[in-house]
């Protein structure tokens, strides 16, 4: 993938850039793998906003992605196409299996149209192949990793994501995350060899707010510039600081707090935060 910079013909185009889509081999998706996707605008079933800054955006169709790949062990597949997916930053690869079935997967880096891919414990260690962590050599870079055996890939699915398998200790495999965190994962969990493609996505300059609106992202407004009816920090004469400790729109404290999770016992080393503990 490469990035194409726009000429400064307008203020919105100045400095902006876009992917050149050089790796895309097909413009139309596989119809049998499409499902309708209805925009919720950040609302729940009662019509209340549960996630702010969402709404609008271009109409999309959801592409069904195979995040498990455990029912195709031993069945070879050929990469038929590399396609664009509006629902994620990574590209997707359309696989044609030897038994006639077609499926989408996250497109790994350096996987091209016509390549052969397989899954299973005996699969070769090459980009795109999917196998359990206990069958992958230490030091290998992987992506699309399960957190529970058979649960489907949850970790490292976005563009350019890469996780390194640093050690194996009994029933666990130790993974170094992009954040620098090292954590234990069940060695029976599956992962795909290689890193996710489209790594230049992070370097795209979106240029103007309108391009964010096309993606369904609405503006983020600070609470201190709202009215009292809209936010606990709102109101006051002139420019104010909010007059209280930071809270969210519902009045619950924001910022420093404890957010321990049940999986903390599996974390070997914390991620780099830059904070003194």
Curated annotation (Swiss-Prot):
Keyword field: Ribonucleoprotein, Ribosomal protein, RNA-binding, rRNA-binding
Pfam families: Ribosomal_L2, Ribosomal_L2_C
Ranges of Basic residues composition bias in the record: 37-58, 268-277
SUPFAM superfamilies: Nucleic acid-binding proteins, Translation proteins SH3-like domain
Protein name stated in the entry: Large ribosomal subunit protein uL2
Keyword Ribosomal protein belongs to the record: yes
Protein purpose: One of the primary rRNA binding proteins. Required for association of the 30S and 50S subunits to form the 70S ribosome, for tRNA binding and peptide bond formation. It has been suggested to have peptidyltransferase activity; this is somewhat controversial. Makes several contacts with the 16S rRNA in the 70S ribosome.
Basic and acidic residues composition-biased segments: 23-33, 251-267
Organism: Saccharopolyspora erythraea (strain ATCC 11635 / DSM 40517 / JCM 4748 / NBRC 13426 / NCIMB 8594 / NRRL 2338)
Gene Ontology biological-process entries: cytoplasmic translation
